[in-house]
């Protein structure tokens, strides 16, 4: 809503991955329920690569660890996800929870204030 670039990362359970889970698995739709787990190094890598790669911009992703080879092409990893819709509060595949007009005044004020920064 602010118009600033961002990458929102929602991790699975820290360090609950299996020994064969070497691949980063990005999903969307607010799917974090406790399982599957995620290697904390995968969380750090997704945070870093989301900031460095253009395809990571305006993304809300859940990150998990899965069986398979480690990711080497982070641009492609993020490109396989969908960008969030401009001006929408929720992630692209999230359930639309609360319309902005129904958010508390302090939340609406913060969003308006942060949207003015840098403009």
Name each model feature, range by range.
Residues 1-91:
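Oxidoreductase cofactor-interface core, primarily capturing Rossmann-like NAD(P)-dependent enzymes
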Residues 88-119:
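Amphipathic terminal alpha-helices
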